[in-house]
A protein has these predicted regions:
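Alpha-solenoid helical repeat scaffolds
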Residues: 443-444, 474-478, 507-514, 541-545, ...
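Interfacial juxtamembrane loops and adjacent helix segments
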Residues: 149-155, 296-339
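Short coil turns that delineate tetratricopeptide repeat
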Residues: 470-471, 503-504, 537, 573
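Register position in tetratricopeptide repeats
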Residues: 451, 485, 518-519, 552-553
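Hydrophobic alpha-helical transmembrane segments in integral membrane proteins
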Residues: 260-277, 423-453
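Conserved structural position within tetratricopeptide repeats
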Residues: 467, 500-501, 531-534, 567-570
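Alpha-helical transmembrane segments of multi-pass inner-membrane proteins
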Residues: 2, 12-28, 46-58, 81-89, ...
């Protein structure tokens, strides 16, 4: 008996250690990698999953005879994974790394379900680790605000371990309700620790200036307080007692909420208008792919195409054209999932989130439910699910919500076999992405030469990594720039044409036009620039390139040249800059010669 308990303890200890490593994913970064802030987290996650899987395989015979009670969220998660695979564009292959990461997330979900069933004490341990990451992030942010630690963005002092304040604030908002629940639920040590975490997060959260995170934090913490201190019975009793004033009370609450949202809108009006435009255009794009979707990674191209069509109609306003951009994300995860996985995928995903929270309420895991709720609200106006940190947190919070006490099962061998297969899958996925680390490390070194304009010396290195990183539009743009600067214009265009299918970045179209102009293919260059103007009609740079194109002796068209030059000289830029002044000076010089 003692030996069995000892073996079980080893198994749970390993699960605790590797689970703690996984919850620490947001804190990891690797400056040696290209995009090391995100990719460092991804590779750390894969490594931690491989270690957890190996530990699971080694100790698979040590577990107690408790079986998982499979539930609706388990099935919905698998169904959503199936929809994602079914709608994916396998020929283009826009997001191979996300597929590997998603596979590991599914393995993590079921391994967590397995361990939490065997050892329910791990539920609070994992929540504690999430709180600890929130505390570390909050202290990190304080250090950045006081100038003791550098941020990861030149324009913002506060980023924590993230690239900008938006996702940083969102992560704190997800952890905050868990901390509040701990402070309200426990006594003595954990009670005080919970309040310390709450206080630390509240110090830095306002400084992040993320309205989405503020709303998520208020909604989730309000719900946690209601669930812990009030509940349905008290709510019904209060309603019965003060029934006559209920309607005026709710009217006042709605009015105050409306005033609060109006204030948040006015805080950064252009940003809010930009997001409203994104949501409108994404909604129109969904109508074009309601069933099949565009597939994972298909958002940027579909969005750019639809925005170009929308701006060609009378419905588009000058204000919308002024605030428009070509985002990588929809800044609303539900709309992005609706576009990429179709309406069916959207229904499955929303049902999965809802079922997790339902099980969490039923199991009285109000802290975990609060964390999921904060993420659900934050995802309505941001992009948390495009970052690994939020997915890892969601898996832990969701597994805590869903997992109930295990039962004695007759088919314990089958369950152990399934657990072993899951662990082997995690190891296989780790092996499948192993070469990616070296590729990103090499890319990081190459970027130093690229940024120093050593295009000729690094062009061959970019070519050698093409097959490994051809799904990254940033890499393709840099590769094409090297080819263009070494006068390999045809090859540069081929690379950029692929990048155009992966990204809505207008610079890709501008680069294609410049390379076609260098080859003397003026008609195609003109077509590319006109398409870019349709997508972003208020940008000055494509008009500048058009004016230079029409000024070419072999393609000179005076009326078109003067129209494009006039746009450069008269259009109001978003921000006055040195680049704008240089473009206008250049156009004036060309006009003087003409």
């Amino acid at each position: 008996m003692e030996l069995k308990l000892h073996r079980h303890g080893i198994r749970i200890a390993l699960a605790s250690v590797f689970g703690a490593m996984l919850t620490a994913t947001p804190l990891v970064g690797d400056s040696a990698l290209a995009n090391g802030i995100v990719m460092g987290k991804v590779f750390w996650f894969h490594l931690s999953m491989a270690l957890m899987a190996i530990g699971t395989i080694v100790t698979i015979g040590f577990g107690r005879k408790k079986g998982i009670s499979f539930s609706l969220p388990d099935g919905l998660l698998l169904l959503f994974a199936g929809v994602t695979l079914a709608t994916y564009d396998w020929q283009l292959g826009p997001e191979p790394e996300k597929l590997l990461f998603g596979g590991q997330l599914i393995v993590l979900w079921f391994l967590l379900r397995h361990f939490l069933t065997e050892a329910p004490c791990l539920k609070f341990f994992f929540l504690f680790m999430l709180m600890l990451t929130g505390l570390v992030e909050a202290v990190w942010g304080m250090q950045q605000l006081h100038g003791h630690v550098y941020s990861h963005h030149s324009l913002f002092r506060l980023t924590g371990s993230f690239f900008n304040p938006g996702p940083y604030s969102g992560y704190l908002a997800v952890v905050l309700p868990v901390c509040l629940w701990t402070a309200m639920r426990f006594q003595k040590g954990m009670h005080y620790f919970g309040w310390v975490c709450v206080g630390a997060i509240l110090v830095v959260l306002p400084a992040g200036m993320s309205r989405s995170a503020w709303v998520a934090a208020v909604v989730a913490c309000g719900w946690v307080y209601w669930a812990e201190r009030i509940g349905w019975e008290k709510t019904k009793a209060i309603y019965s007692r003060y029934k006559n004033v209920a309607v005026p009370f709710f009217a006042i609450v709605i009015l105050l909420a409306g005033c609060a949202f109006a204030g948040l809108y006015g805080l950064k009006r252009d940003s809010a208008d930009g997001r409203l435009l994104m949501w409108k255009v994404t909604g129109k794009a969904i109508a074009g792919h309601p069933v099949t979707g565009t597939g994972l990674g298909g958002f940027p191209e579909a969005y750019a195409e639809m925005q170009g069509q929308y701006f060609g109609t009378e419905e588009a306003t000058d204000k919308e054209k002024r605030v428009a951009g070509c985002p990588e994300y929809a800044f609303n995860e539900y709309l992005q999932i609706g576009l990429e996985q179709g309406i069916g995928g959207w229904i499955v995903f929303v049902s999965w989130l809802g079922s997790m929270m339902y099980y969490g309420i039923r199991n009285r895991q109000h802290g975990a439910v609060g964390g999921v709720l904060a993420l659900v609200v934050f995802a309505m106006s941001s992009y948390p699910l495009q970052l690994p940190s939020f997915w890892v947190a969601l898996m832990f919070l969701g597994a805590v919500c869903v997992t109930e006490e295990g039962t004695q099962r007759a088919r314990i061998f089958a369950e152990k076999l399934l657990t072993g297969l899951l662990a082997l899958t995690a190891v296989g996925l780790f092996v499948g992405q192993k070469g990616n680390y070296e590729a990103y490390r090499r890319w990081g070194r190459m970027q130093m030469l690229y940024n120093n304009k050593a295009y000729e010396s690094v062009a061959e290195d970019y070519h050698s990594l093409h097959d490994k990183l051809k799904h990254k539009p940033e890499f393709l743009f840099e590769e094409a720039q090297c080819l263009s600067k070494t006068e390999q214009y045809t090859e540069a265009i081929q690379v950029l044409e692929r990048a155009k299918r992966l990204s809505g970045d207008p610079m890709i179209r501008y680069m294609i036009a410049k390379n076609r102009q260098a080859l003397g293919d003026y008609r195609e260059a003109e077509r590319e620039l006109l398409q870019a103007i349709e997508i972003l009609p208020e940008r000055l740079y494509p008009y500048y390139l058009l004016a230079k194109l029409y000024a070419e002796p072999e393609f000179y068209q005076e009326d078109k040249f003067r129209a494009a030059a006039g746009a450069v000289l008269t259009k109001e830029p978003k921000v006055e800059s040195t680049a704008v002044r240089e473009m206008r000076t250049g156009i004036k010089k060309i006009l003087e010669k003409k």
